[in-house]
A protein has these predicted regions:
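Conserved hydrophobic/aromatic beta-strand scaffold that supports enzyme active sites
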Residues: 1, 11, 39-41, 106, ...
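Active-site catalytic loop in hydrolytic enzyme cores
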Residues: 1-69, 82-91, 95, 162
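Glycine-rich loops and low-complexity Gly/Arg-rich segments
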Residues: 7-10, 25-26, 34-38, 67, ...
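A short linear-motif detector with a strong N-terminal bias
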Residues: 18-22, 29-32, 83-84, 105-107, ...
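CN hydrolase (nitrilase-like) catalytic-core segments centered on the catalytic cysteine
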Residues: 48, 57-147
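C-terminal beta-strand edge segments of enzyme domains
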Residues: 109-195
């Protein structure tokens, strides 16, 4: 994570490695990567920003931990396959935003250009989802760039040919703001699970 002045504020190693079979194709990230062992929240100009990577989005408890630690914005750079992206991408991004009362900024690599290198086509469809379920989507499927970058900026909404987008973010709607719909504060922790027979 690099702040607006170019200073490194922190780094994150993906905790959940993608070991799966999708449409007959086997992915074993653990063969070439090592999993991280902690979560990261950086303070960027007074905004608490949580870091995650791709497959991490499928683990809601990770996002809840960051929200409980004060994350207002959570970044998710990703390369979902076309199959999993079409079925799950938007649902997961919006769910993590709503259930944790945070903005989720989900950049995504685009389509066929990656297929020649990685052997699979990626879904693309970068988006920003807000705490009330609002969603700004960038439906890029034919751009020849290898990725799409989403940035948040407090006052402007503008998407230009350069694929740089500015999305309005109102941090008053996040879980750490007084007077908001306080789902995080109302949640129960440490309940025992009772098995029924």
């Amino acid at each position: 994570m690099i702040d607006p002045r170019g200073n490194v504020q922190g780094s994150y190693d993906k905790v959940h490695l993608f070991n799966a079979v999708v449409n007959g194709t086997t992915f074993r990230a653990s063969d070439v990567e090592s999993a991280g062992d902690h979560l990261v929240i950086a303070d960027i100009n007074g905004v608490k920003v949580g870091l995650s990577i791709c497959f991490d989005i499928r683990f809601p408890e990770m996002f809840r931990q960051m929200a409980r630690a004060g994350a207002q914005v959570i970044l998710v750079p990703a390369a979902f396959t076309r199959t999993t992206g079409k079925a799950h991408w938007e649902v997961l991004v919006r769910a993590r935003a709503i259930e944790n009362q945070a903005y989720v900024v989900a950049s995504a690599t685009i389509a066929s250009e990656d297929a020649t290198v990685s052997g699979f086509e990626t879904w693309g469809h970068a988006m920003v989802a807000g705490p009330w379920g609002m969603c700004w989507q960038i439906w890029a499927r034919s751009i020849t760039a290898s990725g799409l970058l989403s940035w948040i900026w407090p006052r402007w909404t503008r998407c230009e040919r350069s694929c740089l987008c500015f999305i309005p973010v109102d941090l008053r709607f996040t879980s750490v703001s007084p007077g908001t719909f306080r789902v995080i504060a109302c949640g129960l922790q440490g309940l025992d699970v009772k098995a029924l027979r």
